[in-house]
Structure formats: structure tokens, C-alpha cells
Amino acid sequence: MSINIEQAIIHEISQDSQGQLRCRLRPQPLLNSQAVEMMLEELHQTYTSKSGKGFGYFGIHGDDGEANPAFSNALQEYRAGDLGFVEFTGQASKLLQEELAKYDFSQGGFLLMSCYTSMASDFLFVALLSAKSSMTVLDDMELSQNNHLDLSNIQLAARIDLTEWQADKDSRKYISFIRGRAGRKVADFFLDFMGCVEGVNTKAQNKTLMNAVEDFVASSDLTKEERQQCRNKVFEYCSERFDEGADIEIKDLADELADQGMESFYDFARGGCYELDEEFPADKSTLRQLKKFSGTGGGVTISFDGGHLGQRVIYDPISDTLLIKGVPANLKDQLDRRLKGE
């Protein structure tokens, strides 16, 4: 396993017959069974691989608007040994219930909270899971309907880097969270119950890094192939950091490029007009543009590796056209069949 589980528990928040939200609290932590280990390992991997996560910190009431300090205060007591895990998670469940009661779109769910260690850091994972209906075949070959936790489609989840939180009080990114397909407004209650305030615009930082890389290669004496190698190296480094759940470090990235003979990127990035933090989380979807060009519009979708530009793919900005040399075999087959049919 890639994680070492300390404790985990599930509480339920559901509607009663009058439509009021109620908490059903589990009186003790989950046993460290194989089922629990498999569930948390799957959730850890699924969460870590999610791109486009937001990052924030525990807000201060007044300085950060109406940020509620109740969750972070209880977490502090738990970490100090003044509050048990069951009591802490029970308080958190009631905070979430109170926050959910302000909205009319939620049916509740199962609140999973787990403390675990991964790569020498302590984490608190918090997720509101939903049940999903499925069918199974019984021993007598009859069908039966049952419910199971939908682990592959988590939309309301956050992970707190407890080690960073307690070691660096000035950090603004020790809480990561899934933004959710439904948009930020629906996920607001999940951040509000923890008193979380967004602190780092990950996409903006990654976009700025990408711009700095493009300006760096454009101002260098590198050949076209070497420029693409530089882009590929940056993407490779950032992808590795993303997969490890670690931050991009500008100095570390510059050292990687220097090893490839591309000196002075650190001074270039820090000395220019780029407002780059020394460290920030990676966003694969943004940085993928270093390797690929892609776009959709008017019923046309095009995607190709950056190395093909100027060779297999010719762009003419004056005529607003793309010329593709060597049509992919599967596309060529479809086009030939259509022409024969006409």
C-alpha cells in the first residue's frame, strides 16, 4: 500500500421523514480490515490523480470574511491529543449538517474521514460519498438490487496536509479540494464547513510557468528540436511531481533543465515579469499544452504533438488554414470510404 492508515470512520447525514437533515454517528472508528484498506487506497489513488484541484487554507474569521474556525479548532485539539478521533469527526459531521441545512439541493451522504500517512506526510482525508444502486446475481441465479459507495466518482472531497499545516503557518495551499463538475457554487458548502479559503490559483501559476518556458526557449539559441526537448522536459518533470502529489519547485526545475544544457532558467523566470511562486501544485491539463496543440470549434476537433508543427502540420495565419501532411491511417480510411460512397 502507498498509505499507512491511522484511523478512519464513516458518519451518515440523511433526511428524516420531515425533510430535516440528521446525523447518524458511528460510535467507534472503522476496523483496519482489508476492505477498509482497499477502499482508502482506491480513494487515495483516485483523488491524487484528479487534475484541476483547488488549493487553500483555513481562513481567519474577519480577515477572510465569514470563515468558520470551528473545524480547524477541533482539528487542532485532536492533533494535540485533547480530543478523540470519534469526537472530532462527530463534531465535523454536525458542522457539515449545519452547513448543508442552508441549501436545498443536498440529500446528505456518507461522511468519510481518515487520517493516514503517505510519503512522510500526515493527511486528513474528508469526503462526502454517495450510494449507488447496482445489480448482482444471487446463488439461485436471481437478480438482486443493492447499494454500494460510489468511490470512482467522488466530487466532494478535500485533503489536508497536516504536516505542512502545522510546520508552515504562512502556507496557503495545505488544503486541496475537488472543484466538482457541477461548479464551484455547489461545492461551496463543503469548503465552508471546514472554513477553507482558496489560496493558490493553480491554473494561473501553471499558465504563467508555461508562458515563461515559451519565452525562455524563444530568447535562447536553441535549435527547434532542442526547444521542443526543453518543453518536453518541463512537462515530464511537472507530470512526475503531479503523480507524486508534490509541488513544482522552480529551482528544482531549473536544475533539471541545466542538466540538459539549458542554463539560467531560474534567473530568467524569477527576474522577468512573471509572478511565479517558488513552489506551487502542478496542473497537468494546463501544462499539456507544452507538448500538444489542441482545439475544438465549429464541429472540428484537432490535436497533434507540438513537434509536428512546421513539419507534418503547417499553419498559415494569413489564410487561416492548417495543412496536414500524412493523414493518420484510420482517418484516411474513413475519408476514403466516404468519398467512394459519394
From Swiss-Prot:
InterPro entries named in the record: Nucleoid_associated_NdpA
Record key words, sorted: Cytoplasm
Domain of life: Bacteria
Subcellular location: Cytoplasm, Nucleoid
Keyword Aminoacyl-tRNA synthetase applies: no
A Pfam family reported for this protein in Swiss-Prot or TrEMBL: NA37
MF term (GO), any: single-stranded RNA binding
Cellular component terms per the entry's GO annotation: bacterial nucleoid; cytoplasm
Family statement: Belongs to the YejK family.
HAMAP family registered for this protein in UniProt: NdpA (MF_00730)
NCBIfam families, sorted: PRK00378.1 (NF001557)
Name under which the protein is recorded: Nucleoid-associated protein Shewmr7_2293
Organism: Shewanella sp. (strain MR-7)
